[in-house]
Amino acid sequence: MDAPSFIAAAPGERIVTRSPREALAEEFRRRGPGRVIAFTGRRSAELCGGIGLLEEAAERAGCELIRFSRIEPEPVVATVETMCALIREKKPCAVVALGGGSVMDAAKAACLAAQSGWPLAEHFGVNRYSDCHPEARLDRVICIPTTSGTGSEATPYSNIVDPAQKVKKLIAERFIVPELALLIPELTHSMPPAVTRATGCDALAHAIEGFLNVGADGNHPAANEWALESIRLITEHLPRAIAAGDDAAARLAMSFAATLGGMVIRFKSTGLPHLASFSWFGRLEHGIAVAMLLPACWRYYLGNPAVVARTMQLSPLFPGNTPEEVIASFRHFLDSVGVPAALRDCPGITQELLEETARSGAQNKMKLENAPRPVPVAESERILSAILQQTREGDPQ
């Protein structure tokens, strides 16, 4: 099967890759007439042309379009609460997220809290609401991604920053998997090279982290196939998308790859790279951070023989005769797309931050236990420190 076939069979939601503009207008007609709330980035919606698409679809369906664009690159609790209040006040027939992962995550969280009646803070955690109300039927967001990275259009996750505690918090909730996602690759053409690089690396990390997560293989029979297809598409097309933003074939492939990556982590989750970089928001682009951390985490995983075998399955994509050579080949790919070689070259990542990262990461028992090679809690700070220091110094050449 190819990427469109995998995506068409995505469980639990509709992801439209063919005639998405018509599908959006039809969805508004089905739900309307009424109000449509569009959550967007501050400038990206105009730059990519997406806001015009929404206006046209709403007009064709006889719906009033209400736009909210005051969403930070790292959305904070107060912003999501404002979005939640807007949903409650306007009672829309549809909520649309047009943007990158930050916009989609914020909209998913706001839509959930607006309907649950719970304070937003009570949703942080895993299936907090759906475990209490398994029969609830909630309206879900329509997602239109304008980047090719997070795969939030296909996940049950929402990451929100709590400035008071200086941490990014996670909602993992099956009720926020988007009801409908529309993939319109043309909307990603306006991404500058740096954003293309960072988001593409995030998608690549999702696919590889999920593929290496051998303990979660039973969660969905096709997840590893999705991961391999995502990795293949990214290794072939990310360099082209960075070099030429209007390369339509490369942008199409990257859109598919990002969504496949989201589908992968929905069932197999991320690992230590995401854990270790969770508090680095505002200091280093998320996709760059997880990609840089992956080689050192991957080497730790090799202590699990099943990960050794899984690693060698990637040798057609990252050539090597041993697991170490495969990892080195992956790092060479990162070099080829301009990812820094070492954290010491990243001004925002200080030694003090790395020490705090090891201490805080050592408290995340669930993430440590579910890593492809579980991290013993008693040794977690030492192991995370070693991974972080290796990434700080960079791979030996």
Give, region by region, the residue ranges found by the protein language model.
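ATP/NTP phosphate-donor binding region
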Residues: 1-94, 343
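Structural motif
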Residues: 14, 35-37, 66, 93-96, ...
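Short alpha-helical scaffolding segments that buttress acidic/His motifs in well-ordered protein cores
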Residues: 204-208, 254-262, 276, 294-297, ...
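C-terminal charged capping/lid subdomain of soluble metabolic enzymes
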Residues: 315-397
